[in-house]
UniProtKB/Swiss-Prot annotation:
A single cellular component GO annotation: plasma membrane
Protein topology in the membrane: Multi-pass membrane protein
NCBIfam families for this protein: PRK02237.1
Annotated transmembrane regions: 8-28, 33-53, 63-83, 87-107
Subcellular location: Cell inner membrane
Organism superkingdom: Bacteria
Organism the protein comes from: Aeromonas hydrophila subsp. hydrophila (strain ATCC 7966 / DSM 30187 / BCRC 13018 / CCUG 14551 / JCM 1027 / KCTC 2358 / NCIMB 9240 / NCTC 8049)
Protein name in the entry: UPF0060 membrane protein AHA_2410
Entries under InterPro entries matching the protein: UPF0060
Statement: the UniProt record of this protein carries the keyword Transmembrane: yes
Keyword list, A-Z: Cell inner membrane, Cell membrane, Membrane, Transmembrane, Transmembrane helix
Keyword Acetylation included in the entry's annotation: no
Cysteine disulfide partners in this protein: none
Family as reported in the entry's similarity comment: Belongs to the UPF0060 family.
């Protein structure tokens, strides 16, 4: 799988996971409708299915995906929660993305 396709798949996967966790959070902490649990469950099912689309070892995918998840979570903090990330949030996200790139795109023996 190409680098761009892998990154796109990681981004969509992270959004599905974050949405699947954010909706129950709204229900539990802000008194929103219990019906939010339905799209949350569907989002988490989508998340699990998306993880299965990666053609490499599952452990490597999960480790690399964590870097993208950190980046998307900080982006969510800014765009959805309305909290501007600190310099250290941004630095940490970049470090996580560098780790993801090393894990996913390093040369491997066939």
């Amino acid at each position: 799988m190409g680098e761009l396709k892998t990154m796109g798949l990681f981004l969509v996967t992270a959004l599905a996971e974050i949405l699947g966790c954010y909706l129950p959070y709204l229900w539990l902490t802000q008194g929103r409708s219990v019906w939010l649990l339905l799209p949350a469950g569907l989002s988490l099912m989508l998340f699990a299915w998306l993880l299965s689309l990666h053609p490499t070892a599952a452990g490597r995918v999960y480790a690399a995906y964590g870097g993208v998840y950190i980046f998307v979570a900080i982006l969510w903090l800014w765009l959805v929660d309305g909290i501007r990330p600190s310099l250290w949030d941004l630095v940490g996200s970049l470090v996580a993305l560098c780790g993801m790139a090393i894990i996913m795109f390093a040369p491997r023996e066939a």
